[in-house]
């Protein structure tokens, strides 16, 4: 874990460089945090072990609660063999209206053989006028498993705010043993026709993606097709605007709508089913979601 290098930040600077580096390993029948390093206002708020199998639930927090123009926020997280970590945030993230400078978030996840990482941050709000760049790079070893999502809300819905100024650039890449499985890129500017087009956002305010990679023994088409049909039945019962597809052996779900709570509930339900099918685990939602 050497991607992150220390950046010095003076108290008079108008922006932050915040970086968090975490490592998880399996020891004495549970997952523990074996490595932690942070710079700037980002850290682990709490760790919990609510599951009998010793899964570590970690809550990471960025005290400013959002990313302003000029900020650089970086996460680097690694799970060692047999470790199982669930990572979430205490509340919605925010891309604030810019001061003319671009803001950046970089997420690097490295999942070793026979380990499981669940990356489940709460939604991110894109304020009108934000200039946001987000990059997620996930590297899986051959027998690693992953569940994760990204939820974006355009504007502040409580203020009926639309995204008419600024820009958003998101790049997501998922690799296994240096083979690129998924490359997902999104770019738009405030006021773009794409935001209102039926071929784009269709005037909806919430878009989200869910990604899941099963354990190696469940990657055959027999299991994948069976599990995706069960998930489709779940989505139909919930009556939510979610579509499902398979990209090789990666399960992908997409949400497009106006209610971020419905999105969260749908993705949490999919995650709960996959935990049962793939890992024989209960749903065990992070406790912070209930507060």
From Swiss-Prot:
Alphabetical GO CC annotations of the entry are: cytoplasm
Where is this chain's protein located in or outside the cell? Cytoplasm
Recorded hits in InterPro entries, A to Z, give: UreD (IPR002669)
Enumerate the Pfam families for this protein.
UreD
What are the UniProt keywords, alphabetically?
Chaperone, Cytoplasm, Nickel insertion
Its chief place of residence is cytoplasm
Q: What superkingdom heads the lineage?
A: Bacteria
HAMAP family, alphabetized: UreD (MF_01384)
Q: Which function does this protein serve?
A: Required for maturation of urease via the functional incorporation of the urease nickel metallocenter.
Whom does it interact with, and what assembly results? UreD, UreF and UreG form a complex that acts as a GTP-hydrolysis-dependent molecular chaperone, activating the urease apoprotein by helping to assemble the nickel containing metallocenter of UreC. The UreE protein probably delivers the nickel.
According to UniProt, the name of this protein is: Urease accessory protein UreD
Identify the coding gene: ureD
């Amino acid at each position: 874990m050497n991607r992150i290098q220390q950046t010095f930040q003076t108290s008079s600077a108008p922006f932050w460089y915040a970086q968090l580096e975490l490592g998880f390993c399996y020891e004495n029948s549970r997952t523990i945090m074996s490595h932690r390093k942070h710079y700037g206002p980002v850290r682990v708020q709490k760790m919990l072990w609510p599951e009998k199998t010793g899964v570590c639930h970690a809550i990471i927090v960025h005290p400013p609660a959002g990313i302003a123009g000029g900020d650089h926020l970086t996460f680097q997280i690694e799970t060692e063999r047999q470790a199982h970590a669930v990572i979430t945030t205490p509340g919605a993230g925010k891309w604030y209206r810019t001061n003319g400078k671009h803001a950046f978030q970089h997420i690097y996840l490295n999942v070793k053989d026979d380990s499981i990482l669940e990356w489940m941050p709460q939604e991110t709000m894109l304020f009108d006028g934000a200039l946001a760049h987000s990059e997620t790079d996930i590297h899986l070893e051959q027998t690693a498993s992953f569940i994760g999502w990204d939820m974006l809300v355009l504007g502040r819905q409580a203020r009926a705010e639309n995204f008419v100024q600024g820009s958003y650039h998101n790049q997501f890449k998922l690799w296994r043993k240096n083979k690129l499985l998924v490359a997902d890129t999104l770019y738009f500017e405030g006021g773009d026709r794409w935001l209102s087009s039926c071929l784009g956002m269709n005037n909806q305010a919430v878009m989200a993606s869910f990604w899941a990679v099963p354990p190696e023994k469940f990657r055959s088409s027999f299991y994948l097709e069976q599990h995706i049909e069960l998930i489709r039945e779940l989505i139909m019962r919930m009556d939510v605007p979610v579509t499902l597809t398979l990209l090789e052996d990666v399960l992908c779900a997409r949400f497009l709508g106006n209610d971020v709570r419905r999105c969260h509930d749908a993705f949490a339900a999919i995650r709960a089913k996959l935990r049962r099918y793939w890992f024989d685990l209960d749903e065990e939602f992070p406790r912070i979601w209930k507060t």
